[in-house]
């Protein structure tokens, strides 16, 4: 079916796979007595990518060259700026977890227990990005869950087993892959116990959720309805063993530093005790001294803390770190905007003073790295709106006055070396 004669005796060429003619497709590529169209090539590439991704999950966990902690750390460095101690702790914990999974089949008297991870740090310090980067590096299924939307089973809200359902969806309901995935539970501090004293009213979004999460984190058979349906008494459920799923919990834990300071000040009384005022210690330095008893006092139940043995604390990002985040990572925001402007065949220049202004604004807003994109988006909105309709522009320059809202981007035109403000 490679070629046929048309009515006007023109020789029509056809795709040997889908049968479409050369007039129905954008491109037809010839081989030895066969032709393939661009649509079939795209379909083949998609099939190869899907199969390679599936094989990669299995291969990534079974092959002998599992990345070492140093290699994991180096890859994290490419995407996450700062937080050196947290990256080191995570690299070791993740390496040990997947090394443990590789040796599960070997009979041994010593059984290695799972080390789930607790990340403590302010908003925008990189907790979610660290977890996402780890999952991408190891090529395993990954899901982010928001603890604030969870409630106990039987109450309005999300059941904790919905987390496993989302993980299954992310790997096309392949149970074996899901059972070796990574789950990141954000805002874990928001489900802390509301009071130290037991109450007659049930706390369905606090301690109750912690109890439900406890079973999931330590390892249980979760019953998940097939293909995202609702739970129904007469249907068959997919059984997922959560024993080997790595759980990473993250939260800002606002107020935890006060709990730590109160404890350390009590224990640091007497002759020879080193005294350091609260003003001399930043929040990151205080959080590094966190102990299980501090987390219990904050409102987490002891059983859940016991299932999160690896604790990594992240510090607040300063101006220098935020400026580096804008330009240094592989997928840095400035690189992304450069690419967007290049698509319009326009060069974008964001001057160092502008980067500094963006970082300062994010610090004032207390949004950390998470707020950088919205600041840049706001500054570039007008020029991105007008640019597709404007002719002859070769370069756009952003200075600090644009970020602060006191000026407009500078436009440089191709035909003349003049600089003009955008309208």
Swiss-Prot record:
Coiled coil: none annotated. ATP binds at residues 122-129. One of its GO terms (cellular component) is HslUV protease complex. Residues 3-56 form the ClpX-type ZB domain. Transmembrane segments: none annotated. GO terms for biological process: cell division; proteolysis involved in protein catabolic process. Keywords: ATP-binding, Chaperone, Metal-binding, Nucleotide-binding, Zinc. GO terms for molecular function: ATP binding; ATP hydrolysis activity; ATP-dependent protein folding chaperone; protein dimerization activity; unfolded protein binding; zinc ion binding. Disulfide bonds: none annotated. Gene3D superfamilies: 1.10.8.60, ClpX chaperone, C4-type zinc finger domain, P-loop containing nucleotide triphosphate hydrolases. Belongs to the ClpX chaperone family. This is ATP-dependent Clp protease ATP-binding subunit ClpX. It comes from Paraburkholderia xenovorans (strain LB400).
